[in-house]
């Protein structure tokens, strides 16, 4: 049996920062799944650098993407990093903390919308699939407010684990204290090592009912 893995998201799902011809976390996770489950995994990626959570949510209304979500055994989602970067730029100019709260609320609402849409596409009876939401790591550890905002957002994201098939992957913990090693030369996106660590964290979350 071939399993389908559908990956949705932003530049992290694209694999920006990994280096020329180096895989991001998506391809690495696919390989680990194949090893662990002893099954072939078919991968399809819907991702673009710069996407905000509202745009990722909007993708779930496109017929072809909906079809690939319906068929998916495993779905991963990355998002909110671009919302964060925009907030930081505004904060640098205006010094108003509310921009972070607004971005956090916006991201939470969109993530809830994504899960709701996936449930709608899948139908009530299908519960054998997995959804893995990757939370935010902090590429700016020296900016105290950014860390406070990201930690707060991650706490809220964790609350979306409302069903056994949904898990939030703690990317924040993976990168904490290892930014030099796990960030690429642009100091924002993961390096190859960072993506490998992300795929290991995904692997550690297990495969739920797919292991049955």
UniProtKB/Swiss-Prot annotation:
It comes from the Bacteria. This is Spore germination lipase LipC. Its main location: other. The gene is lipC. It holds the Pfam family Lipase_GDSL_2. PANTHER family: SPORE GERMINATION LIPASE LIPC, THIOESTERASE 1/PROTEASE 1/LYSOPHOSPHOLIPASE L1. Coiled coil: none annotated. The active site is at residues 11, 186, 189. Its EC number is 3.-.-.-. Lipase involved in spore germination. GO terms for biological process: sporulation resulting in formation of a cellular spore. The keyword 4Fe-4S does not apply. Keywords: Hydrolase, Sporulation. It is found in: Spore coat. One of its GO terms (molecular function) is lysophospholipase activity. Substrate binds at residues 50, 82. The keyword Hydrolase applies. Belongs to the 'GDSL' lipolytic enzyme family.
């Amino acid at each position: 049996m071939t399993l389908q893995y559908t990956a949705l998201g932003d530049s992290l799902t694209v694999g920006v920062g990994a280096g020329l011809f180096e895989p991001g976390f998506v391809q690495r996770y696919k390989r680990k799944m194949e090893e662990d489950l002893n099954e072939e995994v078919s991968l399809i990626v819907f991702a673009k650098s710069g996407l905000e959570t509202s745009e990722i949510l909007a993708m779930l209304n496109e017929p072809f993407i909906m079809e690939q979500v319906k068929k998916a055994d495993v779905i991963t989602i990355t998002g909110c990093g671009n919302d964060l970067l925009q907030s930081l730029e505004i904060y640098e100019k205006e010094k108003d903390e509310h921009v972070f709260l607004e971005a956090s609320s916006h991201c939470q609402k969109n993530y809830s919308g994504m899960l709701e849409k996936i449930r709608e596409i899948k139908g009530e009876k299908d519960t054998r699939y997995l959804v893995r939401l990757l939370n935010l790591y902090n590429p700016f550890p020296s900016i105290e407010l950014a860390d406070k905002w990201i930690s707060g957002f991650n706490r809220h994201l964790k609350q979306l684990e409302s069903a056994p098939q949904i898990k939030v992957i703690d990317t924040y913990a993976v990168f904490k204290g290892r930014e030099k090693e796990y960030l690429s030369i642009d100091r924002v996106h993961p390096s190859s090592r960072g993506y490998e660590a992300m795929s290991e964290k995904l692997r550690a979350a297990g495969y739920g009912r797919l292991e049955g």
